[in-house]
């Protein structure tokens, strides 16, 4: 217990449950044909609830950075540990999802199985990409001053408004003359790597986790809430309002549209957008105050946290079945909450049970 960072266990559990909530919301604005809102009621609840938990993935990234960055061990040893604990379970579950849902095995040579119930696996390749970056940036991080880190965080913060800038372009000038989306600052069909490519995206959350570890001092609960509450409020509005206002419901409900409509609606929900980033900081500020390590922590939180990677990897196998059972029987908010909670409990118990199997358990669940 002495070397364990207790609040990160609380964070893993909370973020993992948030992921379940995000995926429990999806059937209320998506179906097999594309975008679908059955009613205004469903649209409102899906928006209100999902917008509150978009911080889930960035919180996982910050937890990894808080623990691992800067890297203090030899690069080879660092990569070998990540290979066994992260990449191997990902590879095995990728195969499990592909087999379970009759996916195309050939596509696995190019990407994770995004076209079946396995889209949530995108998180792991992204995280592995950050792991590739960590040893490269560690010498700089060890020597960087707080002012320098804040400067880079400011640059990254500017990139979090890009989703809104793309929308502004569309509002001012209409559809781009070439390409699927408006390009910004050096991006074009023959160059996907614009000016801010290397200081944008989840890199910022990695840097933010490092900043909290090295430079953020302890503050009281009252001050924490005084800072976190307005950050969360502003961020939540920036996430929820654009989604809700852009639902194409002029002709009434139900609303049926191509899948691309949902992708467009989710612009303000993007994990690296400004609104989500504000809620991430707010959540992290509050969660790092959770340091109680008594019986509840030892018997509930820590086991759930240790099993959380396996829970994440397998949860869609459980959630899809639970959703099919509960969605027709409950109203939207109850169905979302119950689906998320039941899926979290079942997947966590399965992950904890699998982890008890010698060797194989860690291959599957990290």
Language-model features, listed with the residues they occupy:
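Alpha-helical transmembrane segments and their immediate juxtamembrane cytosolic regions
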Residues: 1-366
